[in-house]
Swiss-Prot record:
This is Maturase K. The gene is matK. Keywords: Chloroplast, mRNA processing, Plastid, RNA-binding, tRNA processing. Usually encoded in the trnK tRNA gene intron. Probably assists in splicing its own and other chloroplast group II introns. Its main location: plastid. Signal peptide: none annotated. The keyword Ribosomal protein does not apply. InterPro entries: Domain_X, Maturase_MatK, Maturase_MatK_N. It is found in: Plastid, Chloroplast.
Length: 522
């Protein structure tokens, strides 16, 4: 029990007690402004295009916001004024600034709460002497790991991490490393008013997209803290249920430290939960051959154990979310499949284990005999059906895969339209370069090529045949030669390599740090 207590309390000494005064420092919002404009400025998140960021990010506006935000129904009164006086300049200005205030304070808060993480990240990298290699951030780096480890595993569990979580639980998660009560109180109040704003905004305008996009960084941070708390308990169960020291999770956690997403967690009540709901089944989790990988809200858990063992882990996750996070989670959302018979969808690929049998004839003097060998190969394929569904959601084609025009892009120039479609194709080719069979990707390129032609024809009120005849070679160059150009730069010229057979070669790029937008829609 002492070891358990120390495991949960080992990070409590790093709590930050004085963060609330930083809300009144002007350089915090200048930093948020710079990170919003700089594509490589953020340590923890991808670049974010923020609505309304300009020179108005000043300390005076922040003080005015914090004064007015504590007034009752500040956000809702601003929305009411805007809806009742949509064409009156003064009220429209108040509506704009209320959105701008909420956006600015959320970005500033996100910058402030990143400070303890940055300090922890720097100290951890120095302590563990981890090299600052950008290859550790690559999403594609997980596939060589799976290719090396999954060949002898039996089962895989597809896990969908539930969301949204209650706002109060999100605040409680932060209490373990932030002792600043005013800051937590302000966050709780801001989330409450933000929730009221969204409820009213959805009712009146049937849309929440713009406002939710403005505060994307803050809620992504809160989501990461929630996900890590789930994994914190999972790693504890995995670590203390086996007598063997495992290394896979250590590598995984080190990569999370490099990402800068290792968060301290609330430790109170966790011990009670573990004793009540997990203590009786710890003996059955003695499986040293287990690996876990997650990206965003989807995770996989692979094991060399039995189906019964995987079911125990399944209900372990269900109990965690139901009893600790008070989230009703249906067990059918966790699928358990046998690797030798089923494929699993992860990170935009359909992965499976292929078994190939070969027969070797052995001749020894007058005796000859046949030897049958069975080899297992980790295979990754392009999920064509899922990509077509994603393209249909983005309005590039129908659900059946029939290309359609993109009316929203008809205001662009011809070169701009071609460049946008070509960039989508290049990104897809780059991301799915690890597929062993790329014929399905050619179909996706064909859909985008014809959708581009239909968009140009719609813009000029002409036929598709006319634009295919006029720009056929150019479209062919944009949509079909990009993969060959990449291969010609990567592979040595001394090695003969016919591009006609390049669809079977798998290449993993170590510069991909985010999922393709079309893949992310799945």
């Amino acid at each position: 029990m002492e070891e358990l207590q120390g495991y949960f309390e080992k990070d409590r000494s790093r709590q930050q007690p004085f963060l609330y005064p930083l809300l009144f420092q002007e350089y915090i919002y200048a930093l948020a402004h710079d990170r919003g404009l700089n594509r490589n400025g953020s340590i923890f998140y991808e670049p974010l295009e923020v609505f309304g960021y300009d020179s108005k990010s000043s300390l005076a506006l922040v003080k005015r916001l914090i004064t007015r935000i504590y007034q009752q129904h500040f956000f809702l009164s601003s929305v009411n004024d805007s809806n009742q006086n949509q064409f009156v300049g003064h009220h429209h200005t108040n509506f704009f600034y209320s959105r701008f205030y909420s956006q600015m304070i959320s970005e500033g808060f996100a910058i402030i709460v990143e400070i303890p993480f940055s300090l922890q990240l720097v100290s951890y990298l120095k302590e563990k002497e981890i090299p600052k290699s950008h290859n550790l951030r690559s999403i594609h780096s997980i596939f060589p790991f799976l290719e090396d480890k999954l060949l002898h595993f039996n089962y895989v569990s597809d896990i969908l991490i539930p969301h949204p979580i209650h706002m109060e639980i999100l605040v409680q998660i932060l209490q373990c490393w932030i002792q600043d009560v005013p800051l937590l109180h302000f966050l709780r109040f801001f989330l409450h008013e933000y929730h009221n704003w969204n409820s009213f905004f959805i009712t009146q305008n049937k849309s929440i997209y713009l406002f939710s996009k403005e505060t994307k960084r803050l809620f992504r941070f809160l989501y990461n803290s929630y996900v890590y708390e789930c994994e914190f308990v999972f790693v504890f169960l995995r670590k203390y249920s086996s007598y063997l020291r495992f290394t896979s999770f250590r590598t995984f956690l080190e990569r999370r430290y490099f990402y800068g997403k290792m968060e301290h967690l609330q430790t109170e009540h966790l011990i009670i939960v573990c004793c009540d709901y997990f203590n009786g089944t710890l003996w059955s989790f003695k499986d040293p051959f287990m690996h876990y990988a997650r990206c965003q809200g989807k995770a996989i858990l692979v094991s060399k154990g039995t189906h019964l063992l995987m079911k125990k882990w399944k209900y372990n996750f269900v109990n965690l979310w139901q009893y600790y996070f008070h989230f009703w989670y249906q067990s059918y959302r966790i699928h358990i499949n046998q690797l030798s018979k089923h494929s699993f969808h992860f990170l935009g690929y359909l992965s499976s284990l292929l078994k190939n049998s070969s027969t070797v004839r052995n001749q020894m003097l007058d005796n000859s005999f046949l030897i049958d060998t069975l080899t297992t190969k980790f295979d990754t394929a392009v999920p064509v059906i899922f990509l077509i569904v994603s393209l249909s959601k983005a309005q590039f084609c129908t659900v059946s895969g029939h290309p359609i025009s993109k009316p929203i892009w008809t205001d662009l120039s011809d070169s701009g339209i071609i460049e946008r479609f070509g960039r989508i194709c290049r990104n897809l080719s780059h991301y799915h370069s690890g597929s062993s069979k790329k014929q399905g990707l050619y179909r996706i390129k064909y859909i985008l090529r014809l959708s581009c032609a239909r968009t140009l024809a719609r813009k000029h009120k002409s036929t598709v045949r006319t634009f295919l005849q006029r720009l056929g070679s150019r479209l062919l160059e944009e949509f079909f030669t990009e993969g060959e150009q990449d291969l010609s730069l990567i592979l040595p010229k001394a090695i003969p390599f016919p591009f006609q057979g390049s669809h079977r070669e798998r290449i993993w790029y170590l510069d991909i740090i985010r999922i393709n937008d079309l893949v992310n829609r799945l």
